[in-house]
């Protein structure tokens, strides 16, 4: 048969579309598999990272369909976000038009690759129907106390009049206009993800062995649970006077055992003490200028530069020794962790040591060591009256107990995890369904009025939020009292959309207008059996999605605690050693590969070039090699005959080459189960199929050719579906796309080829019966290498079953 990729692929894509091949069945009695690859942003064109992601997911989906599973593999578009606004400015086009034009084009690209996505469940997160339910979730969370409004310091571009994410601040300047970014306090909405901090952490245990350890560790560190002592540093009398009688401030430490080594207290630039000092204008000009300079740096900037700070001219009293401790403002102290203040022990903390060394502050050693800083939780305590000579755990407990007994402090649990700020001063996002009324305050929109839709008649300039200037959108009636009011003009962080899309996919599309989730279908499909996406989403997206699953469970929308049962993080696609990017000029357009070689070639190369978890280096010659293999597969089709069942073969009557050919075919079949259900090492399965095809080539038995071809097409169908469907349809009526069984007799070897080594050096090889005794094998081996051992004393005779014989001789 001749291989014409373009014609064959178009033919089968139309057949699959017509017969609903990709659509899940409504029969909920069937075993199910929900395979989901992270949905794309509609940037305009697919890139090779997309092709890799979706090739993996589609291979798994087809494998399980062939084995009788009800499979859901949906696709959609994460379509809100800044790139659409940037395109609107650059190309003078409305973000909505740009977005949906891109969705149309990328959908055609996905179709051309033969991915078996459920098209009935396709949606974009910017669709009004999706926004409608998203806004309902927001309101229900608000009613439950999971959403609140507060003022916080944000990155602000005065020129563009907008808040910037940390990633959009480059060297202290706006990534888009280059204007200096300042820190500005602004009101915004926050989700109380911290209410779920402990559950998010504890449930990671349920994902062990099913999620990559790296991802679990990253999430654990991001949540950052820590145990310690919280107490109050009291100001001395002169400091109290400066601060209008303020008594002191709370600090949190995970190392109460080192409290005798405190030589200064450090507070964050945003701390109330700093604010009071600046408001009272009692600091000298240099100190005030330094504080304002640090305040205008984003938290991310502060963490990436050298330790810096300024003395505030205040003192607190050490609770145990009554010594006066100087108070400093330091750029390394986080405002939102532990109250924004720390006790600093430079002898036993690297960060504190660096700061103290820079500013010549006292360094007091309280654990014996030859070098400083010594940060281990072990050693002999010195200069510590209550705990001298104690071990770490005992010392820690004694200090905490002392503080609790005296009423100075308490043992507490802290988390690094912060509440999630979702307010964005953007147009192209889901409107926050809140209304500002002079009589009622801030109130949610009525559910019956959802969705709050974006107005189309806006002009995107990049300066400020267009919604804030749109009077028709902004002016409204209060849903509570009917008075004139104003609508919230901030839109939601786009992570909000991607935090629940997987559950929407699981809901029967026929119910989408009536309910957020159809309970029967969602309970059947959720949780996602296999989730696939890049490691770059390990923290934010995956953590927010896990939070949403739990919050929506508690609101009565969903049942399960975790959204994704198993996670595969695929590596990047590289070219010339670097990640593909337009700026580097090293991109490869999937359309070009499809037009030249076909979709199956692209898919075969992607899955053969490297294990999915590893980075993949693009190689043009390897792409051509994949194309040649598919052609070779076609060329060999004439060696098989038409049948809809496997030929019946008497294995004992076969010659050596025939048995070897069958063995290689069934070894590939045996490997396939682990590859598709566990390791995802598609490259090893493809290599096994290539080896099996070579084994078939080395013999002429038509029955064995037919059996082998029948099985090889079954194994390769998830990887190169168009070619395999065409060949199978011609030869086997597609009857081979089902679960196939192993045949035990194939794996029984009649003979063994054993290497013989003398003192570790290979000298010869023998072929013996697979049923020969060990003693007989050793006897045959010694005869074979007699000229190397004659007259020598044999010290050891070692037989490694099925592999080799090693003889150790003296001299």
UniProtKB/Swiss-Prot annotation:
It is found in: Cytoplasm. PANTHER family: LEUCINE--TRNA LIGASE, MITOCHONDRIAL, LEUCYL-TRNA SYNTHETASE. It catalyses: tRNA(Leu) + L-leucine + ATP = L-leucyl-tRNA(Leu) + AMP + diphosphate. Keywords: Aminoacyl-tRNA synthetase, ATP-binding, Cytoplasm, Ligase, Nucleotide-binding, Protein biosynthesis. ATP binds at residue 582. This is Leucine--tRNA ligase. A motif ('HIGH' region) lies at residues 40-50. The gene is leuS. Gene3D superfamilies: 3.10.20.590, HUPs (3.40.50.620), Isoleucyl-tRNA Synthetase, Domain 1 (1.10.730.10). It is an enzyme of class 6 (ligase). GO terms for cellular component: cytosol. GO terms for molecular function: aminoacyl-tRNA deacylase activity; ATP binding; leucine-tRNA ligase activity. Belongs to the class-I aminoacyl-tRNA synthetase family. A motif ('KMSKS' region) lies at residues 579-583.
């Amino acid at each position: 048969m001749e291989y014409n990729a373009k014609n064959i692929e178009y033919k089968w894509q139309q057949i699959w579309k017509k017969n609903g091949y990709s659509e899940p069945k409504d029969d909920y009695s069937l075993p199910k598999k929900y395979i989901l690859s992270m949905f794309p942003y509609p940037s305009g064109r697919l890139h090779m990272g997309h092709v890799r992601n979706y090739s993996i997911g589609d291979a798994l989906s087809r494998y399980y369909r062939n084995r009788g599973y009800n499979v859901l593999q949906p696709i959609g578009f994460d379509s809100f976000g800044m790139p659409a606004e940037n395109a609107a400015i650059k190309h003078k086009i409305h973000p909505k038009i740009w977005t949906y034009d891109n969705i149309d084009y990328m959908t055609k690209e996905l179709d051309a690759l033969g991915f078996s996505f459920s098209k009935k469940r396709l949606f974009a997160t910017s669709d009004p129907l999706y926004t409608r339910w998203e806004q309902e979730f927001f309101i229900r969370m608000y009613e439950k106390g999971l959403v609140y409004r507060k003022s916080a310091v944000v990155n602000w571009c005065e020129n563009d009049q907008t808040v910037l994410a940390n990633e959009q601040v480059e060297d202290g300047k706006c990534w888009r206009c280059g204007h200096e970014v300042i820190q500005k306090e602004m009101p915004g909405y926050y989700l109380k993800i911290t209410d779920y901090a402990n559950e998010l952490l504890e449930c990671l245990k349920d994902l062990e062995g099913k999620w990559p350890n790296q991802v679990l560790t990253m999430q654990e560190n991001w949540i950052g649970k820590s145990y310690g002592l919280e107490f109050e540093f009291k100001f001395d009398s002169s400091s109290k006077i400066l601060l209008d009688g303020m008594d002191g401030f709370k600090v949190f430490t995970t190392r109460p055992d080192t409290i005798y080594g405190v030589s200064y207290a450090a507070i964050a630039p945003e701390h109330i003490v700093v604010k009071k000092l600046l408001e009272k204008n009692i600091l000298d000009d240099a100190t005030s200028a330094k504080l304002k300079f640090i305040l205008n740096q984003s938290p991310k900037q502060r963490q990436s530069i050298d330790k810096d700070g300024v003395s505030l001219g205040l003192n607190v009293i050490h609770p145990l020794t009554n010594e006066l401790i100087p108070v400093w403002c330091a750029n390394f102290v986080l405002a939102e962790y532990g109250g924004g203040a720390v006790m600093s022990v430079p002898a036993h903390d690297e960060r504190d040591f660096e700061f103290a060394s820079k500013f010549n502050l006292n360094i007091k050693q309280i654990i014996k060591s030859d070098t400083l800083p010594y940060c281990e939780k072990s050693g002999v305590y010195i200069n510590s009256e209550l705990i001298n000579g104690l071990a770490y755990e005992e010392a820690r407990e004694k200090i905490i107990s002392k503080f609790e007994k005296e009423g100075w402090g308490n043992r507490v649990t802290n988390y690094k995890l912060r509440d999630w700020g979702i307010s964005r001063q953007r147009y192209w996002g889901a409107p926050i369904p809140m209304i500002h009324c002079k009589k009622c305050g801030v109130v949610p929109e009525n559910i019956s009025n959802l969705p709050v839709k974006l107005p189309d008649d806006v002009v995107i300039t990049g300066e400020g939020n267009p919604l804030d200037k749109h009077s028709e959108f902004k002016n409204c009636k209060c849903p509570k009292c009917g008075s004139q009011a104003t609508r919230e003009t901030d839109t939601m962080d786009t992570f909000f959309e991607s935090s629940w899309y997987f559950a929407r996919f699981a809901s029967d599309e026929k119910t989408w207008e009536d309910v957020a989730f159809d309970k029967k279908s969602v309970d059947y499909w959720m949780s996602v059996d296999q989730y696939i996406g890049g490691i770059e989403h390990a923290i934010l997206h995956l953590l927010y999605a896990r939070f949403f699953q739990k919050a929506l469970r508690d609101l009565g929308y969903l049942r399960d605690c975790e959204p994704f049962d198993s996670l595969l993080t695929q590596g990047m696609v590289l070219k010339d050693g670097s990640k593909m990017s337009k700026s580097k000029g090293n991109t490869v357009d999937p359309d070009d590969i499809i037009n030249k070689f076909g979709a199956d070639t692209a898919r075969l190369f992607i899955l053969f070039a490297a294990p999915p978890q590893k980075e993949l280096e693009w190689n043009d010659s390897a792409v051509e090699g994949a194309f040649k293999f598919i052609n070779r597969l076609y060329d060999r089709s004439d060696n098989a005959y038409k049948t809809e069942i496997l030929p019946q073969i008497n294995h004992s009557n076969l010659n050596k080459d025939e048995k070897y050919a069958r063995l290689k075919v069934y070894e590939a079949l045996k490997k396939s189960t682990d590859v598709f259900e566990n390791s995802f090492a598609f490259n090893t399965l493809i290599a096994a199929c290539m080896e099996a095809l070579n084994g078939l080539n080395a013999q002429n038995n038509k029955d064995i050719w037919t059996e082998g071809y029948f099985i090889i097409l079954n194994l390769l169908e998830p990887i190169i579906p168009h070619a395999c469907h065409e060949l199978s349809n011609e030869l086997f009526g597609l009857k081979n796309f089902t679960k196939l069984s192993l045949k035990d007799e194939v794996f029984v070897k009649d003979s063994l080829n054993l290497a013989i080594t003398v003192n570790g050096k290979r000298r010869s090889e023998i072929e013996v019966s697979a049923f020969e005794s060990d003693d007989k094998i050793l006897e045959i081996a010694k005869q074979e290498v007699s000229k190397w051992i004659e007259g020598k004393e044999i010290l050891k005779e070692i037989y490694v079953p099925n592999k080799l014989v090693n003889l150790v001789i003296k001299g």
